[in-house]
Swiss-Prot record:
It comes from Mycobacterium avium (strain 104). InterPro entries: Peptidase_A8. This is Lipoprotein signal peptidase. GO terms for molecular function: aspartic-type endopeptidase activity. It catalyses: Release of signal peptides from bacterial membrane prolipoproteins. Hydrolyzes -Xaa-Yaa-Zaa-|-(S,diacylglyceryl)Cys-, in which Xaa is hydrophobic (preferably Leu), and Yaa (Ala or Ser) and Zaa (Gly or Ala) have small, neutral side chains. The active site is at D134, D148. One of its GO terms (cellular component) is plasma membrane. It is a multi-pass membrane protein. Signal peptide: none annotated. The gene is lspA. Pathway: Protein modification; lipoprotein biosynthesis (signal peptide cleavage). Its EC number is 3.4.23.36. This protein specifically catalyzes the removal of signal peptides from prolipoproteins. Its main location: membrane. The chain crosses the membrane at residues 21-41, 74-94, 98-118, 146-166.
Length: 182
């Protein structure tokens, strides 16, 4: 006679939650972003390039009222609201997150978004209108900070994961429709 289920699922039967990994990646990106911005503001002369590798890679301190890589300048309050929505959405999604790769990608986006939000809320000219500190210049690319490539890299990772069939709420690749019917 088979045993009746007790109604509780053993911890090893449940897929692992990845919120801790997501938050660790986000905290690392956020800390790097804040520390590098504080150092840039303290040590770099505004608008004057400091060569690192010739004229190709320089430290160049600028204040950016736009989005990543100086896009959407002049829409600071809209960008602040969008970034706040992204942060809230990632926290909401994080409760159901199972995939470690999605945790890394979302953590990169969360850390970068929060890094730039810190500037938007606490830097001049004022809350919701603060300008983001950018200081890395590579070739012809717009000046950026640690948060910008983190957000872009995290987004690229999520697109690649989606293309190859990895969902945020499963451990591996999703099964094809014909395999799941067997």
């Amino acid at each position: 006679m088979p045993e009746e289920p007790t109604g509780s699922t053993a911890p090893q039967d449940r897929p692992p939650r990845r919120l801790r990994l997501l938050l660790s990646v986000a905290a690392t990106v956020l800390a790097l972003d804040i520390v590098t911005k504080v150092l840039a503001v303290k040590l770099l002369p505004p608008g004057q390039p400091v060569p690192i590798i010739g004229d190709t890679v320089t430290w160049t301190l600028v204040r950016n009222s736009g989005a990543a890589f100086s896009m959407a300048t002049g829409y600071t309050w809209v960008l602040t609201l969008i970034a706040t929505g992204v942060v809230v959405g990632i926290f909401w999604m994080g409760r159901r997150l199972v995939s470690p790769w999605w945790a890394v990608g979302l953590g990169m986006i969360l850390g970068g978004a929060m890094g730039n939000l810190v500037d938007r809320f606490f830097r001049a000219p004022g809350p919701l209108r603060g300008h983001v500190v950018d200081f890395l210049s590579v070739g012809w690319w717009p000046v950026f900070n640690v948060a910008d490539p983190s957000v872009v890299g995290g987004a690229i990772l999520l697109v690649v994961l989606s293309i190859f069939g990895y969902d945020f709420d499963t451990v591996g690749r999703r099964k094809k429709a014909d395999q799941s019917r067997d």
